[in-house]
Amino acid sequence: MSCNSPWSNTEPWSRRRWLASGVALAAASSTALPAWATDSRPPLTLRGTPLLPRGEGQMRFFGLNIYTARLWAADGFDPAQHAAHPLALELTYARTFSARDIAERSLQEMKRQTPINKAREADWTNKLAAVLPDVKPGDSLLGFHRPDQGAMFQSGGRTLGTVDDPVFSGLFFGIWLSPATSEPALRTALIAQR
């Protein structure tokens, strides 16, 4: 699959803006939404692997909706080994955030899973902030986890950029999928079988 076009088999109406970002706030609460019963979009693909809707949920902070998260994964997805599987995570924002704020919060959440030295933290923060756009309510962004390669981010069907580091990518998507997440209810909603 070309990195530019995981949307080659979708309708233009479904080319919404996407992101996987780290705005997961430690004190927030999540509310599970119904599974993907009404989503009629064709499956996403990553390197020829179909990714099917898996689950969705809302990220809330003191009752305020921050974003809605949706997970796509291939058949055979094992949440305990999320970094070994191709997957996609969409976040649709209900609030305004700068790319820099998203990147900094993402690194805080990634450090919940494992220690990250200051040099690597600064490098990853800068790379992520350079790839991500600022977001406002209604913006959706999509992140693809490419095992053994890294993360790719898209908005509106176009590639924003990549962070070509599989360790970064595994930890980044672990913000939502790792058992060490600050949002276990959101994780449960995302990994629920559709």
Walk through the language-model features, giving the residues of each.
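N-terminal secretory signal peptides
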Residues: M1-W13, R17, S21-T31
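Terminal leader/tail segments of proteins
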Residues: S2-C3, W36-S155, T159-R194
